[in-house]
Amino acid sequence: MLPTARVNAVTVTALAKRRIDAAWFQRPADTVARELVGCALVHGSRAGIVVETEAYLGAHDGASHARFIGKGAGTKRTSVMYGPGGVAYVYLCYGIHEMFNVVTGPAGRGQAVLIRAIAPLVGLGEDPSIGRGPGKVTTALGLDRRHDRRDLAAGTLYFAAIEDAASPPIAVGPRIGVDYAGAWASEPLRFWWRDHPAVSRRGSR
């Protein structure tokens, strides 16, 4: 975890100068998912440190929404996944939780990264549980489906590198809640900051 003094020194103004550009997201989802851990997710005056992510690899991935393209209602909602990387994909899960993702890779790949957990950085207090889970991420940062398809390289919603932050220790395991996905349920596509108190689930299952 970042030292308290270091966290307190971070400001949104400083983060804005270290915004991650769209080109950075033009890579495979599993690569981006791993490297987003330790970066900041910023929305307006609030920011959290990404501590847990999941990668979704396209239409062949049995857990990915990209597999629904061309199948009725899924087409409109999930078409954003086939656009260029660096764009937000926000959807409602089980009629309750807004889920925030970033599209990755070149257009046509259908890949995305789900932000599963953040730790408070700016404007979120000090409780590590505030962003512990994807539904809490969006609640903490004030995100919902109005932010779907937003360009994360412009505007007040973006990812940023944290200056002088050491690379966090990364743990890898299967994604959560995808038992329906057959063999894909056991693929090691969840990445988290090892032993961080803000992670939604620290074990591999």
Please describe what each predicted stretch is:
Residues 2-205:
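Conserved, well-structured core segments that form or line functional sites
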